[in-house]
């Protein structure tokens, strides 16, 4: 199974994927280096993920995209005015990719982002702290792990290192460390979504069928 992992960051979503051939696209060279170190068998490409999707979407069996979330986040909106922050336009690449995939992608896909400060322009599936746009059904619960409360702790980065099973302090680039750590998808949620897309969850089992939402 060929998988495209866009805006791959450090591969939080990808950690528990197995039996697949992954191409990861990340624009930040330092994140790409650490991703390759973490997943040496993946193909890692330093490039614009938005353009890469347009050029290569037909080559994969499953596509995961996590476009940058800061311009959509409630935290950024609530922080307006603090420390001289000015309002900014939401980055519409998120919705460009959703619309493009909805109309042109024949394989399974998942677009992930934060819950925004506005009403989502395209209906999504809300799970925990994230929204997901998919062309397949998702279980009502993606993970038994709980992130809540970590961001309020004094040792936030340390707690996030423990939660994601990764030492984020390896990162020596220009991005803010705790933001990178906060934005990583829970690896159990990533596995549940991937396994669902691949059809591992048996939808003929009535116990499984009952946990699926309608598209």
Where do the model's predicted regions map?
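SAM cofactor-binding core of SAM-dependent methyltransferases
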Residues: 1-53, 64, 72
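Class I S-adenosyl-L-methionine
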Residues: 25, 52-62, 69-215
